[in-house]
């Protein structure tokens, strides 16, 4: 049966709008993740990931993710998916990160690798396509990395995107579009966007300074000049310091013993400093010379900056001083709307309950500390009273001993009489 053209076009449109999910991981099958994620053996002392929802959460099962478990370690873990190219379509990379340990220095980013990666040998120098996510180290580094590998070179974004640095779960999203634009979102809100060509140094500049252009010798960039009619007053030059006119040689000054007496010097009240002629507008002033630019012969536009031949592996390749970070809700797709919806259905559903649980724990901890402090003060007060009672007992004992000694001495004296 032939379908009407409008209906047929509608069905085609629905099919075209269907999102493609290249990778999704929520860790909802217990230890099943260990069959999908491969540990690198490049170093024998890589840190271990464990499945955990952490010390506080919105939903104990849904919030389970990969948690770093050992301090001061490098971590290297990855999962493979069916290779795909993002040529001609949007790429969306999304995941959640929770630094519940109040991280001081460590990465919270992911890397997307091409098909050729040996997962068992993945390490910090393994070539990747894209690196994206938060990185924190001390007060100076709290940024979201967005790094693209372009023609074998890792190119960093020219903008500073600040990441979240609290203890709660946050949703990070990178969108790369086939028109060479991008968008970075945190918690489903845009924090940065723009052009790949403008915000990364992928290509040589479109314009360069004309190598043949030279500033004219008579080009005067001085806005002000000395007034040629101004002259220094005749009485201007005075010494900065003069002998103190009120000083007198001490009466007991012996020049043979003390040398020739010289009065101390003081600041000269008539000293005016260095004379400088007054300034006037320069009649020959032409402004700052601007080096003329020309088209850069080495510049060549690239409409495929955004595109990669294939993506096949998502990896966690990072360093952490203090462990405890939880990664969850990984998603790689070609559909921005689906990614936003997925974020709302995962992070969005549990974020409020997570905060409530943390607030409750903090309040319980505060009350516990108050109770411990109260108990400590009470114990100190009891110890103080016991010490005072002990001192009183010792004083009474000393007084008693003194009385006994006095009585004994008196008795002895009486016997001697």
Curated annotation (Swiss-Prot):
The keyword Calcium applies. Calcium-binding chaperone that promotes folding, oligomeric assembly and quality control in the endoplasmic reticulum (ER) via the calreticulin/calnexin cycle. This lectin interacts transiently with almost all of the monoglucosylated glycoproteins that are synthesized in the ER. Interacts with the DNA-binding domain of NR3C1 and mediates its nuclear export. Involved in maternal gene expression regulation. May participate in oocyte maturation via the regulation of calcium homeostasis. Residues 1-17 form the signal peptide. Residues 198-308 are annotated as: P-domain. Monomer. Component of an EIF2 complex at least composed of CELF1/CUGBP1, CALR, CALR3, EIF2S1, EIF2S2, HSP90B1 and HSPA5. Interacts with PDIA3/ERp57 and SPACA9. Interacts with TRIM21. Interacts with NR3C1. Interacts with PPIB. Interacts (via P-domain) with PDIA5. Interacts with CLCC1. This is Calreticulin. In blastocyst expressed in all blastomeres (at protein level). In embryos, expressed in spleen, kidney, liver, fat, muscle, ovary, granulosa cells and cumulus cells. Residues 252-261, 380-408 have a biased composition (Acidic residues). Residues 191-255 are annotated as: 4 X approximate repeats. The lineage of its organism: Eukaryota, Metazoa, Chordata, Craniata, Vertebrata. Sequence repeats lie at residues 191-202, 210-221, 227-238, 244-255, 259-269, 273-283, 287-297. The modification N6-acetyllysine is found at residues 159, 209. Can be divided into a N-terminal globular domain, a proline-rich P-domain forming an elongated arm-like structure and a C-terminal acidic domain. The P-domain binds one molecule of calcium with high affinity, whereas the acidic C-domain binds multiple calcium ions with low affinity. The interaction with glycans occurs through a binding site in the globular lectin domain. It comes from Sus scrofa. One of its GO terms (molecular function) is mRNA binding.
């Amino acid at each position: 049966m032939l379908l009407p053209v409008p209906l047929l076009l509608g069905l085609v449109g629905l099919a075209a709008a269907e999102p493609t999910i290249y990778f999704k991981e929520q860790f909802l099958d217990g230890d099943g993740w260990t069959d999908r994620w491969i540990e690198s053996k490049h170093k024998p002392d890589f840190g271990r990931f464990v499945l955990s929802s952490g010390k506080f959460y919105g939903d104990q099962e849904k919030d389970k993710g990969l948690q770093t478990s050992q301090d001061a370690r490098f971590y290297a873990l990855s999962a493979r998916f069916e290779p795909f190219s993002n040529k001609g379509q949007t790429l969306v990379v999304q995941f959640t990160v929770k630094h519940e340990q109040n991280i001081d220095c460590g990465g919270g980013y992911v890397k997307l690798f091409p098909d050729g990666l040996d997962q068992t040998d993945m390490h910090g120098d393994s070539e990747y396509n894209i690196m994206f996510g938060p990185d924190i180290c001390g007060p100076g580094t709290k940024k979201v990395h967005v790094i693209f590998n372009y023609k074998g070179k890792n190119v960093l974004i020219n903008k500073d995107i600040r990441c979240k640095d609290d203890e709660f779960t946050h949703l990070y999203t990178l969108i790369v579009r086939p028109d060479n634009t991008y968008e970075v979102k945190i918690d489903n809100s845009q924090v940065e966007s723009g052009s790949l060509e403008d915000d990364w140094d992928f290509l040589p500049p479109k314009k360069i300074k004309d190598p043949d252009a030279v500033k004219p010798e008579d080009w005067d960039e001085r806005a002000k000049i000395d007034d040629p009619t101004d002259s220094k007053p005749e009485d201007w030059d005075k010494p900065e310091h003069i002998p103190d006119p009120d000083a007198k040689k001490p009466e007991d000054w012996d020049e043979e013993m003390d040398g020739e007496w010289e009065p101390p010097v003081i600041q000269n009240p008539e000293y005016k400093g260095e004379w400088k002629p007054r300034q006037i507008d320069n009649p020959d002033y032409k402004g700052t010379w601007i080096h003329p630019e020309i088209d850069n012969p080495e510049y060549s536009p690239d409409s495929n900056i955004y595109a990669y031949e294939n993506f096949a592996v998502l990896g966690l390749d990072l360093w952490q001083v203090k462990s405890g970070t939880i990664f969850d809700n990984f998603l790689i797709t070609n559909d921005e709307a689906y990614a936003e919806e997925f974020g709302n259905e995962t992070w969005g559903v549990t974020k409020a309950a997570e905060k409530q649980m943390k607030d409750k724990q903090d309040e319980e901890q505060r009350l516990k500390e108050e109770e411990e402090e109260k108990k400590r003060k009470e114990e100190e007060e009891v110890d103080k009273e016991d010490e005072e009672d002990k001192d009183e007992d010792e004083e009474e004992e000393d007084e008693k001993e003194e009385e006994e000694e006095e009585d004994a001495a008196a008795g002895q004296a009486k016997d001697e009489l």
